Amino acid sequence: MDSFIFLRSIGTKFGQLESSPAILSLTLAPILAIILLLLFRYNHRSSVKLPPGKLGFPLIGETIQLLRTLRSETPQKFFDDRLKKFGPVYMTSLIGHPTVVLCGPAGNKLVLSNEDKLVEMEGPKSFMKLIGEDSIVAKRGEDHRILRTALARFLGAQALQNYLGRMSSEIGHHFNEKWKGKDEVKVLPLVRGLIFSIASTLFFDVNDGHQQKQLHHLLETILVGSLSVPLDFPGTRYRKGLQARLKLDEILSSLIKRRRRDLRSGIASDDQDLLSVLLTFRDEKGNSLTDQGILDNFSAMFHASYDTTVAPMALIFKLLYSNPEYHEKVFQEQLEIIGNKKEGEEISWKDLKSMKYTWQAVQESLRMYPPVFGIFRKAITDIHYDGYTIPKGWRVLCSPYTTHLREEYFPEPEEFRPSRFEDEGRHVTPYTYVPFGGGLRTCPGWEFSKIEILLFVHHFVKNFSSYIPVDPNEKVLSDPLPPLPANGFSIKLFPRS
């Protein structure tokens, strides 16, 4: 939305300047200089063969066309149209940068497996500013490795087993408070609240409902701002995101100060939650993380846990309803686990590992509705690929849509068919299924999100025997990320006796 406001405001300002040639000249001079510079950058490499495609308008490129299709029912259309016209390697311009899009598993592999060799991480300015320059998202090389090591103390398999009981308890409490006794609920807002509640509890042990709501509001504002055009003017999503980030840092800084005191006195343990893990982490040289690094990585973790979890949680029962056979398999699988439990016995790690049909359904939902539309990198050297040259400094983009929704990789891709992932997906062609990225930048929290989603399905089946969507054909839209049910997905509930 800010993109359209920005363009309209530029047009208005140019109209106002027409009566003043001197001011108009002064205003247009730097713009023309930028345009000439961009044209020089695009064309000075006449000796190399650039991919086919078009760069669109100067500065704006084809960003608006991309945003328009992402907010439709067919977000893959932007990529499909250009793939048909130009082939699997083409150039465009997005968010102010000349960009080469690589389609298919070979393109995915190049982008995801060549970190620090051919490409490096460089996200949009608005995203990096709001997430933080000291976050794992922004760091490269050795600094990135150190942060992955730190986060692995919280996100590794052993650590997650220790947090399983608390996560299950939080989800069980959520169903008791928000779902039980209701004839009808709207799933999306409940799922959003649950994700932030789990994060508040396991990231920094905040259980107070009022403070959780405050953090929820701030983090959603930051999330929206990070995906907007970086216009720092009153009323824009970006400005609101910056203000929310300042307030969030203020709250978290006070939590950090209190936790340090509790760790020194022995009230808190070093593996109590993510906050304790980050505060007590030391690298090989004995160095600790800075407070800013801790704040930035909290922001990054919230984004990661939200992006990879909210869509499959909100869509899983909508999709299962469209496939009665798998709906029955998932429910029977969960009922078998429930039936084997003694009164008051908690779900175990072994139980999670046995949820093969449930996990296949989740994997298929992530195939149909990947949490991100694309993965951007910056070329750190000239890249020679498929007969073309991608110049150093250009952006390189691969998109899950160019494989997840293509007939040649997943027959009848519009159909919800979890059986594609039988046998742990061994027959799925490598680099065709990339909902969590890959290589050094694989989402570090994907296992955390997996557990959240499986537990969510488990507790739903534990509480309800069936459900009926109010609108089974409700649209799924991205505004701009991730893809979600347009009206929140309301369902009628039938409690389990």
Curated annotation (Swiss-Prot):
Pathway: Alkaloid biosynthesis; taxol biosynthesis; 10-deacetyl-2-debenzoylbaccatin III from taxa-4(20),11-dien-5alpha-ol: step 2/3. It is an enzyme of class 1 (oxidoreductase). Belongs to the cytochrome P450 family. This is Taxane 10-beta-hydroxylase. Involved in the transformation of a taxadienyl acetate by hydroxylation at C10 to yield taxadien-5-alpha-acetoxy-10-beta-ol. The keyword Cell cycle does not apply. Heme binds at residue 443. Its cofactor is heme. It comes from Taxus cuspidata. PROSITE patterns: CYTOCHROME_P450. GO terms for molecular function: heme binding; iron ion binding; taxane 10-beta-hydroxylase activity. Keywords: Heme, Iron, Metal-binding, Monooxygenase, Oxidoreductase, Taxol biosynthesis. Its EC number is 1.14.14.105. Disulfide bonds: none annotated. Gene3D superfamilies: Cytochrome P450. PANTHER family: CYTOCHROME P450 26, P450, PUTATIVE (EUROFUNG)-RELATED. It catalyses: taxa-4(20),11-dien-5alpha-yl acetate + reduced [NADPH--hemoprotein reductase] + O2 = 10beta-hydroxytaxa-4(20),11-dien-5alpha-yl acetate + oxidized [NADPH--hemoprotein reductase] + H2O + H(+). GO terms for biological process: paclitaxel biosynthetic process; sterol metabolic process.
